[in-house]
């Protein structure tokens, strides 16, 4: 307990900052003084009209600029379609609050002063664009800190990565391509590179017609090649559930070659879990021939290592890029299970069975590799060739102990997965970004081998390979001065599967052809409204663990197995969303979304019970699965220090199981997260209320709350940060109830929670780059 108190005290201590500059603040309103203005351009000028600081107002109309030298200045605030506001100020250190700023109805003040407002930021149909070249702060700030100039985009104190509206970025692209120095998983170099290496930042909002992204992503356009130098990050994690992780990552960029290295080690030995269940099986006439009660106690531990290295090099003034990567990993795990089962039949004595099992699995080091080459002849136009190879193997030894057998029973399983993927991508975009096209073609090959030698002497498994040839094509464009964006695409694929079931010698060969279309649109209208709509068709092939016919009999009354006869599924999704931005202080945004999904040949997990009340769980193409949902999301800001996001949703799901039985149910969910800026630290809180144990056979869904609490701190000068948190703060080691049913049985399961967990995560960044001075730009227009 004393250690916990010590860490908490050390964690929140912070030195009092010394203000060496003047912080100028204000809040921008329209000419009527009623509505706040987002994305207003704010500039601070010297008496000779030289720009010394710039920013854009956020969703509440607030802005903040740091002026580094004392003296007299002139501040201007402008916005497209409105007049401008001009005021002379004197900076002498500390803070200068300009209060409420009303934009004027004309630009006479700017013209008289000889100042021409520069467009820093604008909002398009699917993105927010910031012109870095027009901001003098780019020469003083690093890339990571500069990102906060885009309203809503900032570095998460919790882990040091960028997020938008408390949502982590899905992807980071440099010049619209994957980059080996800076990416979603390697963001720390931006803390040591000046922002003037960028010319433009594009924050791509979710559901972009061009990128089809589910979460926000970032596209950075460079003004010059990234500098030579090195950076590294160390991250560590430890929890009260005996789960630990340590990951060092480093990147070096030299004139000869660039090298990236990443190593990770993890260890986990979580508390054991005890689950209880009861099951009643019914005969065809509705009588109950048997009832079943049981419990199982499981425990496991695992440790793993992962090592990856990538090499990269550019040629022809950064137009030609090469990347090669190699990696390997190892995983060792041990599982222990004890079960006790009691079955009651009418007119017979109760039968009790006690079993135990241990299982040791080793996945040895195997080589993974990849290669990528890009050539661009101008921004938005280029070709990419890519190859990846993934290789993994595992070997498991299982000991089964049963009262009836006496001696232990032994099973041995060996599994391997080898994948090759080669593709070529061509994209084209006109200079004005009014239209473009993308086409990608490739071939994927997967080789699955699963073999099990059972204690009985029988052999099971499969020898299975799959080839997929595909071509994707997309046309995209924008209308109405980029207020509307659209995309139309189609994917064709031919799937050829060949294999044999080792148990029955049955052929697993089959092939199929899929035509997968896609349409997307995003439209901003009436300034504060955004309409987005899409139709997406997706193909999905079964995973190896779903296909593997290995029969897990460690619990003889609850058997688990795969299904090598599974076929792929094709799903259709239609969605529509309406977003409304508000100019009131406490409410930023409301969004309504509606969607409908249907999968004619859905892959689902299905349980059946035989006449001995033995349950077998496997995967099957059950038939049609459809769902419709509607959600309402809001972004609130009760005070300048508190951000609050809330989303409520309702979903209606319908499963048609083998064309014989239909299961329809409704579910509700709630997600909420809040952040509190205390100055010396940031407090986070999140709440999820979701139904548990949802399957095609679910019944009587129950909504369970899950709350997390965090306290985070980042020391900017030391480039050090971390978080102390509590997961599942509302629960101890209590139970969650779920129910599944079919025409032949009903089962109730009480699953024990692991309960609240305290954890600490830390990260430290170091780096040094040789950086050139910024070249002054004479044009500030956005392309």
What is each residue range found by the language model?
Residues 41-43, 78-82, 96-136, 167-169:
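Short, acidic, small-residue-rich periplasmic hinge/interaction motif at the N-terminus
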Residues 48-62:
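Short, acidic Ser/Thr/Gly-rich low-complexity loop/linker segments typical of extracellular
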Residues 95-102, 116, 143-146, 162, ...:
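N-terminal periplasmic accessory domains that precede
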Residues 144-178:
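Extracytoplasmic beta-strand/coil segments of soluble accessory domains associated
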Residues 177-206:
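Short acidic/polar hinge/loop motifs at secondary-structure boundaries
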Residues 304-333, 357-502, 524, 528, ...:
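Face-selective signature of the C-terminal outer-membrane beta-barrel domain
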Residues 494-498, 527-573, 596-612, 729-743:
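Surface-exposed extracellular loop regions of Gram-negative outer-membrane beta-barrel proteins
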Residues 510, 539-591, 617-628, 637, ...:
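Outer-membrane beta-barrel signature, preferentially recognizing the C-terminal barrel domain
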């Amino acid at each position: 307990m004393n250690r916990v108190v010590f860490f908490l005290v050390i964690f929140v201590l912070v030195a009092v900052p010394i203000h060496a500059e003047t912080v100028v603040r204000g809040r921008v309103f329209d000419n009527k003084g009623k509505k706040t203005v987002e994305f207003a351009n704010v500039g601070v000028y010297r008496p000779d009209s030289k720009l010394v600081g710039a920013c854009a107002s956020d969703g509440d109309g607030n802005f903040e600029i740091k002026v580094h030298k004392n003296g007299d200045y002139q501040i201007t605030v402008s916005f497209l379609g409105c007049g401008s506001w001009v005021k002379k100020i004197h900076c002498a250190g500390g803070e200068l609050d300009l209060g409420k700023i009303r934009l004027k109805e004309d630009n006479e003040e700017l013209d008289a002063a000889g100042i021409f407002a520069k467009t820093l930021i604008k909002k398009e149909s699917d993105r927010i664009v910031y012109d870095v070249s027009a901001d003098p702060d780019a020469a003083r700030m690093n890339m990571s800190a500069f990102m906060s100039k885009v309203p809503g985009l900032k570095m998460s104190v919790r882990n040091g990565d960028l997020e938008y509206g408390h949502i982590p970025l899905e992807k980071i692209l440099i010049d619209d391509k994957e980059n080996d120095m800076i990416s979603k998983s390697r963001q720390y170099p931006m803390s040591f590179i000046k922002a003037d290496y960028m010319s433009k930042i594009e924050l791509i909002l979710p559901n972009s017609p061009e990128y089809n992204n589910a979460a926000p992503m970032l596209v950075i356009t460079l003004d010059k090649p990234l500098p030579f130098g090195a950076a590294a990050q160390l991250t560590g994690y430890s929890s009260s559930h005996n789960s630990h992780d340590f990951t060092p990552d480093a990147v070096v960029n030299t004139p000869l070659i660039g090298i990236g290295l990443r190593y990770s080690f993890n260890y986990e030995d979580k508390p054991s879990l005890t689950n209880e269940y009861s099951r009643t099986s019914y005969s065809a006439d509705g009588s109950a021939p048997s009832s079943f009660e049981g419990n199982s106690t499981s425990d496991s531990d695992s440790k793993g290592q992962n090592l990856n290295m990538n090499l990269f090099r550019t040629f022809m003034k950064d137009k030609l890029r090469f990347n090669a990567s190699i990696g390997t990993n190892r995983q060792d795990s041990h599982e222990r299970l004890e079960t006790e089962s009691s079955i009651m039949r009418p007119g017979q004595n109760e039968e009790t069975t006690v079993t135990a099992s241990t299982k040791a699995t080793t996945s040895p080091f195997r080589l993974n590799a990849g290669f990528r080459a890009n050539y661009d002849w101008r921004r938005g136009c280029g070709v990419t060739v890519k190859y990846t190879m993934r290789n993994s193997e595992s070997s498991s030894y299982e000991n089964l102990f049963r009262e009836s057998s006496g001696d232990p029973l032994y099973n041995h399983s060996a599994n391997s997965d080898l994948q090759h993927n080669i593709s070529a991508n061509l994209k084209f975009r006109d200079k004005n970004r009014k239209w473009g096209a993308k086409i990608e073609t490739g071939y994927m090959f997967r080789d699955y081998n699963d073999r099990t030698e059972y204690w009985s002497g029988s052999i099971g498994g499969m020898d299975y390979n799959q080839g997929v040839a595909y071509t994707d094509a997309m046309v995209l464009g924008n209308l109405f001065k980029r207020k509307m964006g659209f995309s139309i695409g189609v994917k064709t694929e031919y799937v050829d599967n060949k294999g044999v079931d080792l148990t029955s010698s049955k052929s697993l060969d089959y092939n199929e052809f899929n035509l997968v279309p896609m349409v997307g649109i995003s439209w901003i209208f009436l300034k504060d409204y955004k309409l987005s709509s899409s139709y997406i068709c997706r193909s999905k092939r079964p995973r190896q663990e779903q296909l593997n016919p290995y029969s897990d009999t460690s619990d003889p009354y609850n058997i688990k197995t795969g299904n090598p006869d599974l076929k792929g599924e094709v799903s259709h999704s239609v969605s529509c969303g309406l977003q409304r931005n508000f100019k009131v202080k406490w409410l930023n945004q409301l969004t309504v979304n509606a969607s409908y999904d249907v999968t004619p040949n859905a892959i689902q997990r299905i349980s059946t019970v035989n006449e001995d009340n033995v349950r077998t769980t496997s995967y099957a193409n059950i038939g049609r699965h459809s769902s419709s949902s509607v959600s309402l999301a809001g972004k609130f800001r009760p005070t300048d220090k508190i951000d609050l996001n809330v989303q409520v949703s309702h979903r209606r799901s319908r499963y048609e199981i083998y064309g014989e039985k239909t299961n329809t149910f409704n579910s509700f969910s709630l997600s909420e997260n809040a952040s509190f800026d205390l100055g010396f630290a940031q407090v986070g809180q999140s709440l999820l209320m979701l139904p548990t144990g949802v399957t095609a056979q679910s019944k009587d869904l129950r909504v369970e709350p899950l709350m997390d609490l965090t306290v985070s701190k980042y020391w900017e000068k030391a480039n050090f940060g971390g978080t102390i948190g509590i997961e599942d703060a509302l629960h101890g080691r209590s139970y969650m109830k779920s129910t599944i049913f079919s025409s032949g049985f009903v089962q109730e399961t009480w699953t024990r929670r692991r309960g609240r967990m305290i954890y600490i995560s830390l990260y430290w960044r170091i780096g040094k780059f040789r950086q050139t001075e910024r070249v002054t730009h004479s044009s500030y227009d956005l392309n």
